[in-house]
C-alpha cells in the first residue's frame, strides 16, 4: 500500500499502522488492488491526511464510503477530480454553501482547496470495489478511522466537527462539545437533504466559531 501521508499524521498513527488488524487490512487491500478494480487509486488512499496535515487541522467532515463510480473517488470524502460531474450529495453541499455564504457554486468538485485550508475530509472506509458500494466495509478501515477521530479528540480542541447523518454522528460522538464546535445535520444525500441539511448554515457557523477562537475562516 502506497502510504502518502503528512509526516505529523504518520507519527501520530504509527502505532496504529503496526497493529495486527492493520496488517491484515493492508494484506486485504493489496490483494484487492492486485485482482480487482478498486477506487481510489492506491496513491490516493491516504490523500485526506496528505492534503490536511494534523498541525493545520481546523474542521473534520466525516463521510462513509468512497464513490464507487468510474473516475470519481479521489481520496477526500465527497470530493471528485477536476472535470468530473458533481455527484448528487456534492451538488447539495455546494448549493448549501452558496445559500449560506453567498459563494458561487464552483466549476470543480475537487475539494483539495478545502483540505489545504485545514479541512479533514475523512471517509470511514478508505477503499471500495468499482460499482460495489460498501464492498470494503468490515475489513478494518472503520477501526483505523475511529482511531483517527480518537487521536484528534484527545490531542486537539477548538475543532469544528461537521457530522452529517447518523453514521457520521456516531463516529464523531467521541468529540467533546465543551472543547469543540459540533455541528449536526442530516446527510446531504437527495434522500435526506431537504429534512435539515439545507438551511443548516454549517459553513457560516463553522467560520463564526473559528474566528471566535482566533483562527482564520475557511474559504468555502
What is each stretch, according to the model?
Residues 3, 15-163, 167-170, 175-177, ...:
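A polyanion-binding, active-site-adjacent surface
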Residues 1-13:
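Generic N-terminal amphipathic, Lys/Arg-enriched alpha-helix
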Residues 199:
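Short, conserved glycine- and acidic-residue-centered signature motifs
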Amino acid at each position: 500500500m502506497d502510504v502518502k501521508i503528512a509526516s505529523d499524521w504518520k507519527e501520530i498513527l504509527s502505532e496504529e499502522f503496526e497493529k495486527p488488524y492493520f496488517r491484515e487490512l493492508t494484506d486485504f487491500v493489496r490483494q484487492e488492488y492486485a485482482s480487482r478494480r478498486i477506487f481510489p487509486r492506491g496513491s490516493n488512499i491516504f490523500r485526506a491526511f496528505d492534503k490536511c496535515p494534523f498541525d493545520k487541522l481546523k474542521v473534520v467532515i466525516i463521510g462513509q464510503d468512497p464513490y464507487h463510480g468510474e473516475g470519481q473517488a479521489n481520496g477526500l470524502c465527497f470530493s471528485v477530480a477536476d472535470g468530473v460531474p458533481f455527484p448528487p450529495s456534492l451538488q447539495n453541499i455546494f448549493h448549501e454553501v452558496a445559500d449560506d455564504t453567498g459563494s458561487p457554486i464552483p466549476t470543480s468538485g475537487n475539494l483539495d482547496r478545502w483540505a489545504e485550508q485545514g479541512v479533514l475530509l475523512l471517509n470511514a472506509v478508505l477503499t471500495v470495489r468499482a460499482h460495489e458500494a460498501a464492498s470494503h466495509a468490515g475489513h478494518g478501515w472503520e477501526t483505523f478511522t475511529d482511531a483517527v477521530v480518537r487521536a484528534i479528540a484527545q490531542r486537539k480542541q477548538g475543532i469544528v466537527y461537521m457530522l452529517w447523518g447518523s453514521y457520521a454522528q456516531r463516529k464523531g460522538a467521541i468529540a467533546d462539545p465543551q472543547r469543540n464546535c459540533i455541528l449536526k445535520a442530516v446527510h446531504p444525500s437527495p434522500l435526506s437533504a431537504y429534512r435539515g441539511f439545507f438551511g443548516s448554515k454549517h459553513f457560516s457557523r463553522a467560520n463564526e466559531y473559528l474566528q471566535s477562537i482566533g483562527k482564520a475562516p475557511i474559504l468555502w
